């Protein structure tokens, strides 16, 4: 196992990771509330932790990765009623859609994906413990609240002081007259007519949002585990409340390291459903190849805000295509190479970047340098060196989950573009006609064929190994 540094949101600085168990990392990431299709902000969280875990495993770490599913929630109930379907029908459909989207983005499945409704008993046990310890109290309306003033360290993750906060800091926190203090948050919601509920010591009801993650994470990973992650928007109140209720319940430190993925912005504003400026993953995949979306996410540091636009995705497509072109040029001459010999200097430079808080922009810069060296070696017919560069680049791009598709299929992908009026055979025939024209020194005729293909959306690229074609951007 190689040591690495990560930014701990609680300490507000980069620190060296020290595992609780040698060689092992327990990680919990807040997943989706499944009442709609995932948007591009969800994609960023899924992809970021996917490449982080891929890298850690490549470094010899044994990672146990848990990502939960919230399948009971006010929004889920509302949407199911609007659709005139059961909650189970709604959530099952969107869980399937979420998994399909994640797979297309190249994300491996988590080791476990617990659903909130499967842990109701564990949530009730945690709430009972909090009530018994005096950290929570039942209200007359059937709700149970966590008493924030009883937890002295409240605010340590977000850096907020209790006295400075305002009630209703999040749309997910209700202001109720039954609270002792306006910042107290609900652990158990008393049953309402025509809503799902479970029997409990406090009457029929259902869990609050925050208690779900505390119960699922501690049941899957234990009271005290290594890394908890999620989107930056969850820092407060969700993660702050998780810390309070978990530590008040168990008496142990909840998490050693907190990791938060930055916002995706649209026109300078955070992308969110509440602002109505969000794009579903499926919306974007209609216009761009899923791996282009993944590259767009990987190319920015996971903590940095990133601006979403068609221009940015087109730039991502152009950049990703450079790797595919390099592989195509090599494979046309030498075929696919499964050698194990790699360039250790490039690998170490890549690893150094990734060990520094998963610095993907720096890591990708190393990959582009390696890509240039591969192109040079192929051009200069340095077969042995080209093979080493090829195998090394294949290895490192795989760690980031990039360049994982068939080269020709990717280069000729028509996602988001009009269907070509020419077949592959017709394009190849025109390429041959152009080659014949050049051989006959009919350069104007050759140029005319190139332009005719370009007018049809086909770009030709002449290489030492022959002429390649791809779709125009």
UniProtKB/Swiss-Prot annotation:
Give one Pfam family.
Answer: CysS_C
Residues holding Zn(2+): 30, 213, 238, 242
The organism is Acinetobacter baylyi (strain ATCC 33305 / BD413 / ADP1)
> GO CC annotations?
cytosol
Q: What cofactor does its activity depend on? A: Zn(2+)
Task: Outline the subunit composition.
Answer: Monomer.
Q: What is this protein called?
A: Cysteine--tRNA ligase
Question: What PANTHER family does the record tag this protein with?
Answer: CYSTEINE--TRNA LIGASE, CYTOPLASMIC, CYSTEINYL-TRNA SYNTHETASE
Domain of life according to the entry: Bacteria
The top EC class, named as a word, is ligase
Database matches in CDD domains:
Anticodon_Ia_Cys, CysRS_core
Biological process terms from the Gene Ontology for this record are:
cysteinyl-tRNA aminoacylation
Provide the reaction this enzyme catalyses. Answer: tRNA(Cys) + L-cysteine + ATP = L-cysteinyl-tRNA(Cys) + AMP + diphosphate
For binding ATP, which residues are annotated in this chain's numbering? 273
């Amino acid at each position: 196992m190689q040591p690495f540094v990560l930014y701990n949101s609680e300490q507000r600085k980069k620190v060296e990771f020290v595992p609780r168990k040698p060689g092992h990392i327990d990680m919990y990431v807040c997943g989706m509330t499944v009442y709609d299709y995932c948007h591009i902000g969800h994609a960023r969280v899924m992809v970021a932790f996917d490449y982080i875990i891929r890298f850690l495993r490549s470094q010899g770490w044994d990672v146990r990765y848990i990502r939960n599913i919230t399948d009971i929630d006010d929004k889920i109930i509302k949407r199911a009623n609007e659709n005139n379907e059961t909650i189970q029908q709604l959530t099952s459909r969107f869980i399937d859609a979420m998994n399909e989207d994640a797979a297309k983005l190249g994300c491996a499945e988590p080791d476990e994906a617990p659903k909130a409704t499967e842990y109701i008993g564990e949530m009730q046990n945690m709430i009972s413990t909090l009530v018994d310890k005096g950290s929570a109290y039942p209200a007359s309306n059937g709700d149970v609240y966590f008493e924030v003033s009883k937890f002295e360290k409240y605010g340590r993750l977000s850096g907020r002081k209790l006295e400075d906060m305002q009630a209703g800091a999040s749309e997910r926190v209700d202001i109720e007259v039954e609270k002792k203090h306006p910042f107290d948050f609900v652990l158990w919601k008393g049953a309402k007519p025509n809503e799902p509920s479970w029997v409990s010591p406090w009457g029929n009801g259902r869990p609050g949002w925050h208690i779900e993650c505390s119960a699922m994470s501690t049941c899957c990973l234990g009271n005290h585990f290594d890394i908890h992650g999620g989107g930056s928007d969850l820092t407060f109140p969700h993660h702050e409340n998780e810390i309070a209720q978990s530590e008040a319940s168990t008496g142990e430190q909840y998490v050693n390291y907190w990791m938060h993925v930055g916002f995706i912005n649209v026109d300078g504003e955070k992308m969110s459903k509440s602002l109505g400026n969000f794009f579903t993953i499926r919306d974007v995949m209609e216009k761009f190849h899923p791996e282009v979306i993944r590259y767009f996410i990987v190319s920015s540091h996971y903590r940095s805000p990133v601006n979403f636009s068609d221009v940015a995705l087109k730039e991502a497509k152009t950049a990703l295509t450079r790797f595919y072109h390099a592989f195509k040029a090599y494979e046309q001459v030498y075929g696919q190479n499964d050698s194990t010999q790699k360039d250790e200097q490039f690998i170490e430079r890549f690893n150094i970047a990734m060990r520094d808080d998963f610095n993907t922009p720096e890591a990708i810069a190393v990959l582009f340098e390696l890509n240039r060296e591969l192109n040079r070696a192929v051009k200069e017919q340095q077969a042995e060196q080209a093979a080493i560069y090829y195998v090394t680049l294949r290895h490192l791009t795989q760690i980031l989950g990039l360049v994982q598709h068939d080269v020709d299929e990717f280069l000729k992908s028509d996602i988001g573009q009009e269907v070509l009026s020419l077949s592959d055979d017709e394009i190849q025939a025109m390429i041959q006609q152009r080659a014949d024209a050049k051989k006959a020194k009919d350069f104007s005729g050759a140029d005319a064929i190139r332009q005719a293909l370009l007018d049809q959306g086909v770009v030709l690229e002449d290489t030492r190994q022959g002429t390649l074609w791809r779709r125009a951007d």
